[in-house]
């Protein structure tokens, strides 16, 4: 039997994990084992919302050392994280300034300024990336305007996963899938766009040319002295999650469900027409030259904040209580900027309902019901937008990531979208990370080959849409009202 041992470091906005994958070549089986799990979260430092990258690095090294202490010879390591955020370094590799998080308010108003000065359509034609107020282009503009004293000291800007790879190997890399989330990469050249960089205030010398997934960045020397390759995987966690989505055919869509919900489809070509611009569709880079045509949805961030504020520890009990409530009494737009990082999420949700003359969700279950129903309805709207964009309906939706364990939300999604939902795998980002490592090690041929492995080894659950559910009737009523308005226009 031939085995490969690959380690995935998968960092999310609320937690991180070091996972060991064991791949058996002869039977093409893949097993995962959690080695180390640790918390991540936002911190307040010198007036900014930041990440504690030192704590994260310590946790990563602890997890890697645990694997080595078991006597396991690691064949490769890969790191994936969230997008858009970065760490600045001087010429000696020391940090400059703070690792500010995307939920910080320093970028307020800058996206509108960019659209006015450069032209919204021109930015979109160059980058193909959706307009989000915290994209790296606006973060860099905020930095250069608000902290000009830092500029002379900056020699390099590394996105978060590239920073941790650098800390392990001493080698710098700018991985393509994550680089595209910055809104600074030209969609035609796959290199940094000089016009967009100039507006951001950043120096092009801070960046190296983006590299596609599948190359070895450098080596980490383990405590036992072995040199272990660190692979540039699809380092944006959604890109890794999509790689592990067992998409079957061109009519399959995906929903990577976690702190954020990312809904989209794979395409060999980007969509940058006026329809895509109007819908704020993004064309993020994927593996093998594919595009992740998708839309960001605020996701379970709202629930995470409610759980924190209400000190709720028993999530299954909350979901059971939520399921007993009638649907669609409290509806908000989860993508409203007011929910990016409010002082109090519960109060913000209640205020949104009050301002739209709805009943006010008061208790824990009502707040959760509001979030789940609102997300499911937004999923239905986005899926419809995506189908219209490409001119073909979808036949199934694959929900992957930690959020796919929420069976109530999965069923609400199936009912609201009127589509078969396949939930799993849960550890999609980790698996996609491992998939690129196995391809780099010449164990697998390509992404489609890896998806066959995932389909046979992952635990998948199917949710069939119920047209008689409350939320399905609500969606039908909305569509009927919309059609009436269009006919009368």
Swiss-Prot record:
GO terms for molecular function: ATP binding; glycerol kinase activity; rhamnulokinase activity. The keyword Protein biosynthesis does not apply. Its cofactor is Mg(2+). Gene3D superfamilies: 3.30.420.40. It catalyses: L-rhamnulose + ATP = L-rhamnulose 1-phosphate + ADP + H(+). Substrate binds at residues 83, 236-238, 296. GO terms for biological process: glycerol metabolic process; rhamnose catabolic process. CDD domains: ASKHA_NBD_FGGY_RhaB-like. GO terms for cellular component: cytosol. It comes from the Bacteria. The active site is at 237 (proton acceptor). It comes from Escherichia coli O127:H6 (strain E2348/69 / EPEC). Involved in the catabolism of L-rhamnose (6-deoxy-L-mannose). Catalyzes the transfer of the gamma-phosphate group from ATP to the 1-hydroxyl group of L-rhamnulose to yield L-rhamnulose 1-phosphate. InterPro entries: ATPase_NBD, FGGY_C, FGGY_N, Rhamnulokinase. Pathway: Carbohydrate degradation; L-rhamnose degradation; glycerone phosphate from L-rhamnose: step 2/3. It holds the Pfam family FGGY_C. Keywords: ATP-binding, Disulfide bond, Kinase, Magnesium, Nucleotide-binding, Rhamnose metabolism, Transferase. Monomer. Belongs to the rhamnulokinase family. ATP binds at residues 13-17, 259, 304, 402. This is Rhamnulokinase. Its EC number is 2.7.1.5. Disulfide bonds join 68-222, 353-370, 413-417.
